[in-house]
Design a protein with these regions (language model features):
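Surface-exposed, gly/pro-biased binding rims or lids
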Residues: 4-39, 176
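Beta-sandwich strand segments
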Residues: 2-16, 81, 159-166
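Membrane-proximal extracellular "stem/stalk" segments
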Residues: 27-180
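Extracytoplasmic/cell-surface-exposed regions of Actinobacterial cell-envelope-associated
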Residues: 4-5, 99, 210
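Cytoplasmic C-terminal tails of single-pass
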Residues: 201-211
Length: 211
């Protein structure tokens, strides 16, 4: 029994050691430094949200680092209309390596979502996720249109103080089909009103001519 207990303790100790590999350690001559290798979007022009941001960071130091921060989205004079979190899970970047962090802005109207059928995500013939527009009229005030600027602000600890990392990217949301439909509706309305006014004016002039 003592041998069994000792073996269990040894197993637990080995397992515990494996879990603690990335715990912070005071390394002599430790260098903590992070650079932005890329701050980009999956595209620059959108008809509707979502917009997915990719932040690629490079750890140029010799110890692992877990930077965190936010992306602040502005639209003209409207500041911070959305705030997205980066690296919420506190994922580490290993020394001399890159790591990508993604964050998605989907707070719009309408918005593309994954098509779900029978509780499963629908894929097309090429294995890509099929998406469809979700029209939640309670979010009608969140119709996005125009130029947007995303400003990234991350922070990491260099061992002495918090070091900021910044980046900026711009993109456009143009719901062109909604604009086209609205234009056509307005055009028909204008033609209808114009025809009605012309008809009324013609009848009035004819009536005046008879009298």
């Amino acid at each position: 029994e003592d041998k069994m207990a000792a073996k269990e303790k040894e197993t637990a100790l080995v397992g515990g050691t494996a879990v603690l590999v990335l715990l912070e350690a005071r390394v002599p001559n430790a260098t903590r430094s992070v650079e932005v290798a890329e701050f980009s979007l999956d595209r620059r022009f959108y008809e509707f949200l979502p917009a997915t941001f990719t932040v690629r960071l490079k750890n140029t130091g010799n110890v692992h680092i877990a930077p965190r921060g936010n992306i602040f989205i502005d639209s003209g004079s409207a500041k911070d209309i959305a705030i997205l979190e980066i690296n919420r899970e506190k994922g580490n970047i290993l020394p001399q390596s890159n790591r990508d962090f993604e964050s998605t802005w989907s707070d719009g109207f309408p918005v593309y979502v994954e098509r779900i059928e029978d509780g499963k995500v629908v894929l097309d013939e090429e294995g890509q996720v099929v998406k469809e527009l979700k029209w939640d009229w309670n979010d009608a005030s969140k119709l996005r249109f125009g130029k947007y600027t995303a400003k990234m602000l991350l922070i990491y600890d260099d061992g002495e103080r918090d070091i900021p990392i910044e980046g900026e990217v711009s993109f456009y949301v143009v719901p062109w089909r909604m604009i086209l439909v609205s234009f056509v509706v307005l055009l028909f309305a204008f033609v209808g009103v114009r025809s009605t006014v012309k008809g009324m004016w013609r009848r009035l002039t004819q009536k005046d001519a008879v009298t």
